[in-house]
Amino acid sequence: MWSEGRYEYERIPRERAPPRSHPSDGYNRLVNIVPKKPPLLDRPGEGSYNRYYSHVDYRDYDEGRSFSHDRRSGPPHRGDESGYRWTRDDHSASRQPEYRDMRDGFRRKSFYSSHYARERSPYKRDNTFFRESPVGRKDSPHSRSGSSVSSRSYSPERSKSYSFHQSQHRKSVRPGASYKRQNEGNPERDKERPVQSLKTSRDTSPSSGSAVSSSKVLDKPSRLTEKELAEAASKWAAEKLEKSDESNLPEISEYEAGSTAPLFTDQPEEPESNTTHGIELFEDSQLTTRSKAIASKTKEIEQVYRQDCETFGMVVKMLIEKDPSLEKSIQFALRQNLHEIESAGQTWQQVPPVRNTEMDHDGTPENEGEETAQSAPQPPQAPQPLQPRKKRVRRTTQLRRTTGAPDITWGMLKKTTQEAERILLRTQTPFTPENLFLAMLSVVHCNSRKDVKPENKQ
């Protein structure tokens, strides 16, 4: 039904066109306008073909079309014929008021909106959604007024080939801006610009209702195309994943099979080497710190011992000067002490001397000092320091057996100094180093006499 009404002009021959000499006969006009109702639902310029056929006898169809609209909307609108005659290249603004009056009148009487009525047409559905056609108006056979090519050869269904591609570019863009952006990106579509400007001029009419209806028309295909796009994207992603899985799975499995073996074998070896190396470094650092501490301690002891020996030598000289009879006894004791010092000095290079711990300052015997030293907790060490201890113990026992004089120790020196201080207190002499030294000499002399007397008695 729609196709017959739309292309009715093609079937009417030129000889049967209504003449201009009967303008008053409204009945004939109404009868002739009956098959033109479906084109009235379309936009002006798309369905009527008198703009392409510039024959003189077809001017009455414009008058009849305007009369049919005016008959419904109100009083007839009579203007110049130049406003109703549309040529091939003249797209002036005189068409807009005519289209505005027709559209307003049709909206008052019709029950459905213009885009809904157009949507029911099988031929106009795609054209309203996708206004760009693969072939421009100028290239179509309708653009030539005098051509003998039939208008049936040009079908609007050709525009369906680019429907899916064009829907991706026209989702939420205004109709005027979308044409400019697409034509700027594609220089091949420069021929379609005059036709597209004509369509945008119709769309951007000053009434607000047409803008709302056009936005609704554009929203409907965008919803449909979003579903189609989602389905197509899901299918494409599934195919791509299948291809990538088939191509990459064997490579990944081979890589994992080859890479896992050396990884598990190499990982446990590294921490063992690191731990052993760290333990060795820790032990070396401990040994170095211990050796440094021992060396510093031995130096301090040697310095103190030398000072004591020097002082003791000076005291002995002063005693001999005052009492030359004490020279033999003192020399014998000093030789023994010097021999012990030499033997102990050789061992002190390896182990610190334990000479001071053998007897406390209070005069305790050597065994008690050794017991306390052995009972004290000591860190585990190598068996090297044990050998010199045994040698030293043997040496001391041998010296005790061979010598009859007692060993001079720090305890004995302390006792002599205490006795010398007592002598100075008794005599009320000042505590000067010289007086103290002399008192110590007297104490040593008295003790030596005590030790010599029992030997003479035996």
UniProtKB/Swiss-Prot annotation:
<feature type="compositionally biased region" description="Basic and acidic residues">
    <location>
        <begin position="1"/>
        <end position="18"/>
    </location>
</feature>
<feature type="compositionally biased region" description="Basic and acidic residues">
    <location>
        <begin position="116"/>
        <end position="142"/>
    </location>
</feature>
<dbReference type="GO" id="GO:0005794">
    <property type="term" value="C:Golgi apparatus"/>
</dbReference>
<feature type="modified residue" description="Phosphoserine">
    <location>
        <position position="114"/>
    </location>
</feature>
<keyword id="KW-1017">Isopeptide bond</keyword>
<feature type="cross-link" description="Glycyl lysine isopeptide (Lys-Gly) (interchain with G-Cter in SUMO2)">
    <location>
        <position position="180"/>
    </location>
</feature>
<feature type="compositionally biased region" description="Basic and acidic residues">
    <location>
        <begin position="63"/>
        <end position="107"/>
    </location>
</feature>
<protein>
    <recommendedName>
        <fullName>Periphilin-1</fullName>
    </recommendedName>
</protein>
<dbReference type="GO" id="GO:0005694">
    <property type="term" value="C:chromosome"/>
</dbReference>
<feature type="compositionally biased region" description="Basic and acidic residues">
    <location>
        <begin position="217"/>
        <end position="230"/>
    </location>
</feature>
<feature type="compositionally biased region" description="Pro residues">
    <location>
        <begin position="377"/>
        <end position="386"/>
    </location>
</feature>
<comment type="function">
    <text>Component of the HUSH complex, a multiprotein complex that mediates epigenetic repression. The HUSH complex is recruited to genomic loci rich in H3K9me3 and is probably required to maintain transcriptional silencing by promoting recruitment of SETDB1, a histone methyltransferase that mediates further deposition of H3K9me3. In the HUSH complex, contributes to the maintenance of the complex at chromatin. Acts as a transcriptional corepressor and regulates the cell cycle, probably via the HUSH complex.</text>
</comment>
<feature type="cross-link" description="Glycyl lysine isopeptide (Lys-Gly) (interchain with G-Cter in SUMO2)">
    <location>
        <position position="109"/>
    </location>
</feature>
<feature type="region of interest" description="Disordered">
    <location>
        <begin position="1"/>
        <end position="51"/>
    </location>
</feature>
<feature type="modified residue" description="Phosphoserine">
    <location>
        <position position="133"/>
    </location>
</feature>
<keyword id="KW-0158">Chromosome</keyword>
<feature type="modified residue" description="N6-acetyllysine; alternate">
    <location>
        <position position="240"/>
    </location>
</feature>
<feature type="modified residue" description="Phosphoserine">
    <location>
        <position position="110"/>
    </location>
</feature>
<keyword id="KW-0597">Phosphoprotein</keyword>
<feature type="cross-link" description="Glycyl lysine isopeptide (Lys-Gly) (interchain with G-Cter in SUMO2); alternate">
    <location>
        <position position="240"/>
    </location>
</feature>
<feature type="region of interest" description="Disordered">
    <location>
        <begin position="345"/>
        <end position="406"/>
    </location>
</feature>
<dbReference type="GO" id="GO:0005829">
    <property type="term" value="C:cytosol"/>
</dbReference>
<feature type="cross-link" description="Glycyl lysine isopeptide (Lys-Gly) (interchain with G-Cter in SUMO2); alternate">
    <location>
        <position position="235"/>
    </location>
</feature>
<keyword id="KW-0963">Cytoplasm</keyword>
<feature type="cross-link" description="Glycyl lysine isopeptide (Lys-Gly) (interchain with G-Cter in SUMO2)">
    <location>
        <position position="160"/>
    </location>
</feature>
<keyword id="KW-0832">Ubl conjugation</keyword>
<feature type="compositionally biased region" description="Basic residues">
    <location>
        <begin position="388"/>
        <end position="398"/>
    </location>
</feature>
<keyword id="KW-0417">Keratinization</keyword>
<feature type="modified residue" description="Phosphoserine">
    <location>
        <position position="201"/>
    </location>
</feature>
<comment type="subunit">
    <text>Homodimer. Component of the HUSH complex; at least composed of TASOR, PPHLN1 and MPHOSPH8. Interacts with SIN3A and HDAC1. May interact with PPL.</text>
</comment>
<feature type="modified residue" description="N6-acetyllysine; alternate">
    <location>
        <position position="235"/>
    </location>
</feature>
<feature type="cross-link" description="Glycyl lysine isopeptide (Lys-Gly) (interchain with G-Cter in SUMO2)">
    <location>
        <position position="227"/>
    </location>
</feature>
<feature type="modified residue" description="Phosphoserine">
    <location>
        <position position="197"/>
    </location>
</feature>
<feature type="modified residue" description="Phosphoserine">
    <location>
        <position position="140"/>
    </location>
</feature>
<dbReference type="GO" id="GO:0045892">
    <property type="term" value="P:negative regulation of DNA-templated transcription"/>
</dbReference>
<dbReference type="GO" id="GO:0045814">
    <property type="term" value="P:negative regulation of gene expression, epigenetic"/>
</dbReference>
<feature type="region of interest" description="Disordered">
    <location>
        <begin position="63"/>
        <end position="284"/>
    </location>
</feature>
<feature type="cross-link" description="Glycyl lysine isopeptide (Lys-Gly) (interchain with G-Cter in SUMO2)">
    <location>
        <position position="199"/>
    </location>
</feature>
<dbReference type="GO" id="GO:0005654">
    <property type="term" value="C:nucleoplasm"/>
</dbReference>
<feature type="modified residue" description="Phosphoserine">
    <location>
        <position position="167"/>
    </location>
</feature>
<dbReference type="InterPro" id="IPR028851">
    <property type="entry name" value="Pphln1"/>
</dbReference>
<keyword id="KW-0007">Acetylation</keyword>
